[in-house]
């Protein structure tokens, strides 16, 4: 049991090139949705006050400029792979801890191209982890729709070294093996009694808690102009 409130950092993955989208600098991340850039919508959904640190990781100078305007920490890199983005974000978060006691207890990984993500869903992910932390449990928390898991994903500190050791184009989800998944809905916040022995890390002693989103569109990312048009219709529908 822990009486201390868990410290949670946030890493926003904003390095995607969006090759299917456009050649414009910033690609899909700066494409307007309802007059607001896709990435800016994601950042506006984050309850900044709930995090001990927030870092955007990108290859785009235009994204860095936007983050500076919003007073959000940004790390730029030139490496091509997903694991590079994770490693750069983890380095920024860990190096940002001046003292071992400042180290986060968990880190939430957010995709920069999910513009309809809501603050409600993010807060529910954080609270789900904090509830488990208070019970002395180590848990991964994932947003899902009808128990189909997606992003964001929150990883406990017990998995930080494995995240930093990822190679190639592997993301954090590749670490999840054979762990129990239990669902938690945003509306009733009732833990369901269904366990899914599927894709997680039971040998790490880490359970996976899935948190139901308010709509499937929260999990939808923007990979093409068609995706953007669909989300535009949802936004104004």
Protein language model features and the residues they cover:
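Short beta-strand/turn micro-motifs composed of small residues
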Residues: 14, 58-59, 111
């Amino acid at each position: 049991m822990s009486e201390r409130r868990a410290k949670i950092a946030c890493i926003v993955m904003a390095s995607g090139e969006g090759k299917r989208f456009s050649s414009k600098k910033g690609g899909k991340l700066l494409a307007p949705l309802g007059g607001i850039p896709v990435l800016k919508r994601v950042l506006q959904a984050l309850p900044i006050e709930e995090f001990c640190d927030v870092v955007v990781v990108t290859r785009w100078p235009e994204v860095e400029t936007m983050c500076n305007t919003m007073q959000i920490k940004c790390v730029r890199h030139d490496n091509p792979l997903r694991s590079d983005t994770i490693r750069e974000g983890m380095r920024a978060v860990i190096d940002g801890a001046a003292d071992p006691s400042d180290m986060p207890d968990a880190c939430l990984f957010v995709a920069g191209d999910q513009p309809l993500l809501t603050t409600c869903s993010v807060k529910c992910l954080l609270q789900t982890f904090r509830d488990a932390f208070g019970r002395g449990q180590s848990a991964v928390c994932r947003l899902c729709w009808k128990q189909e898991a997606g992003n964001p994903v929150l990883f406990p500190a017990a998995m930080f070294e494995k995240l930093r050791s990822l190679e190639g184009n592997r993301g954090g989800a590749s670490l999840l093996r054979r762990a129990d998944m239990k669902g938690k809905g945003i509306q009733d916040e009732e833990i369901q009694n269904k366990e899914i022995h599927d894709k997680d890390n039971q040998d790490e002693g880490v359970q996976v808690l899935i948190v139901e989103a308010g709509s499937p569109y929260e999990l939808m990312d923007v990979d093409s102009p068609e995706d953007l048009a669909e989300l535009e219709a949802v936004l104004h529908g």
